[in-house]
Amino acid sequence: LFRSDLSLVLDQSVTLQAIQRVAEQTEKAILKNVSVFDVYVGKNLGEGKKSYSVSFILQDENQTLTDKVIDATMDRLITRFEKELNAIIRK
């Protein structure tokens, strides 16, 4: 079981359900849970923007997850969030 967190800056119209849908479509095999642990709205994000801090739980039922697999999974998720939800990843 592995947890990885991302902070995504999104338009205020983007819902948690949209984040979950994109994540599940991207990583059905090893993604076990997607949950938001913080929502932030502030002037420094820009007009009409909000930041979701999202936790992803990854687990492979058949083998131990390697750093390489985890990194590739998170890269795919980030790419999909950027393309489909116009997300900006907060560092």
Where are these regions (language model features)?
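A carboxyl-terminal module marker
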Residues: 2-91
